[in-house]
């Protein structure tokens, strides 16, 4: 919907950020830091609650984003990832990072944004977005309405960080829907760890997905999975716990949940089909899950959300100085993420090939890999190909090289976590 009526300058804010997750928090920080009058609206009554993900962030992400994360939001410093294949073969991807208390991390981001001058409205859900054009039929600003006492809000630009549902994609009909996967987890206790995140590629417990054990201090851990079988997800998770060393270990409510309620899993849906076809339109930029930005193999999204929120804010700040918030002007954002993010089509191709392998084929491939997957030399990669050729040449016809490339592009330096 469009209108020729312009808002009063006194009522106008520069940027409205929709959603207070990691993408929204990052966008708010960098918009406010650029001197823009910034407002954030969050549909939920609290920032960071409920938690939707495994809560991990690599040290490389922290460095890439120039973050100084306070200790109180960290649940554990970790060494990297251990991938466990169907026959029990284990391979390490050693790259340091953190398990976060994600609700505290997101609250810290919004506190940082507030310190810089951003305003936060909780319990505010966007239900309509109306573009306003000037007398020359050029985009001028937005009138954004919804449920909440501070609506309507007039703004020059909007950053959609509303998660996989993508408020603006639905309200503005910005293209195709994204494919999603279900992710759920329990918080458990009495779970020992050696500082690695455990990712189990065990299809019997997580069809077209994987199971994880993400450790926290105090012998706590997030134990969860992602699977394309949304209806059966919790049943698969319960079965995995029952059949492994986790059987009998206590399940507890996470810190952010009312401790008087019955213990139950938490999570949600995650985009897995790659970026949306359209991430920019006149006056609006999509970031994080709203843009379809997750690493497709292991569904890591926080690094991508934080980076895209920062980039969106910087592009909009520049566009406001030139008084040009057209799609053509904001396409600098799309050019930036396409240049910086990994080749999604290659990761998706490898992921498809991975889940076409039988358990035996997956394990055979794993036994051909070095014990440490980080920083493999070209000579080592050649050796892997030769081992596969000797042990099970049929694997080469099953696009196993694409699988290995997908693993490589899921590392922290490629925004994997």
Model-assigned labels for residue ranges:
Residues 19, 161-162, 287:
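Short, well-ordered coil/turn residues at beta-beta hairpins
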Residues 20, 32-51:
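Glycine-rich FAD pyrophosphate-binding loop
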Residues 99, 125-128, 231-315, 320-321, ...:
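FAD/FMN-dependent oxidoreductases across multiple families
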Residues 6-21:
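Beta1/beta-strand and adjacent pyrophosphate-binding region of the FAD-binding site
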């Amino acid at each position: 919907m469009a209108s020729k009526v312009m808002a009063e300058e006194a009522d106008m804010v520069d940027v409205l950020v929709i959603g207070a997750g990691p993408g929204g928090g990052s966008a708010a920080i960098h918009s406010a830091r650029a001197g823009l009058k910034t407002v954030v609206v969050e549909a939920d009554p609290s920032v960071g609650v409920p938690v939707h993900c495994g809560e991990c962030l690599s040290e490389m992400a922290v460095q890439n984003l120039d973050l100084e994360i306070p200790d109180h939001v960290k649940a554990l410093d970790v060494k990297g990832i251990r991938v466990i294949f169907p026959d029990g073969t284990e391979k390490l991807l050693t790259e340091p990072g953190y398990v976060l208390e994600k609700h505290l991390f997101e609250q810290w981001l919004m506190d940082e944004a507030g310190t810089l001058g951003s305003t936060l409205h909780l319990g505010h859900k966007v239900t309509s977005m109306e573009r306003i054009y000037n007398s020359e039929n050029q985009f001028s600003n937005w009138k954004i309405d919804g449920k909440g006492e501070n609506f309507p809000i007039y703004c020059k630009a909007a950053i959609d960080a509303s998660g996989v549902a993508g408020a603006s994609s639905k309200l503005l009909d910005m293209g195709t829907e994204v494919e999603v996967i279900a992710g759920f987890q329990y918080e458990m206790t009495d779970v020992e760890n050696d500082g690695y995140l455990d990712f189990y590629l065990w299809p019997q417990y997580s069809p077209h997905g994987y199971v994880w054990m993400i450790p926290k201090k105090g012998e706590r851990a997030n134990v969860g999975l992602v699977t394309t079988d949304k209806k059966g997800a919790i049943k698969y998770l319960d079965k995995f716990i029952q059949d492994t060393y986790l059987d009998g270990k206590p399940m507890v409510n996470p810190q952010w949940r009312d401790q008087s309620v019955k213990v139950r899993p938490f999570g949600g849906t995650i985009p897995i089909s790659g970026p949306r076809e359209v991430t920019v339109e006149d006056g609006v930029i999509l970031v994080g899950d709203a843009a379809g930005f997750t690493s497709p193999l292991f569904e890591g999204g926080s690094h991508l959300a934080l980076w895209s929120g920062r980039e969106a804010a910087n592009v909009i700040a520049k566009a406001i100085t030139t008084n040009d918030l057209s799609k053509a002007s904001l396409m600098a954002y799309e050019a930036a993420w396409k240049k910086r993010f990994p080749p999604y089509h290659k990761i998706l191709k490898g992921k498809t090939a991975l889940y076409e392998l039988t358990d035996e084929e997956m394990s055979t491939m794993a036994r051909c890999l070095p014990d440490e997957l980080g920083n493999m030399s070209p000579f080592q990669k050649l050796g892997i190909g030769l081992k596969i050729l000797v042990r099970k040449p049929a694997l080469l016809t099953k696009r196993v090289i694409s699988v290995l490339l997908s693993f490589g592009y899921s590392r922290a330096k490629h925004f994997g976590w």
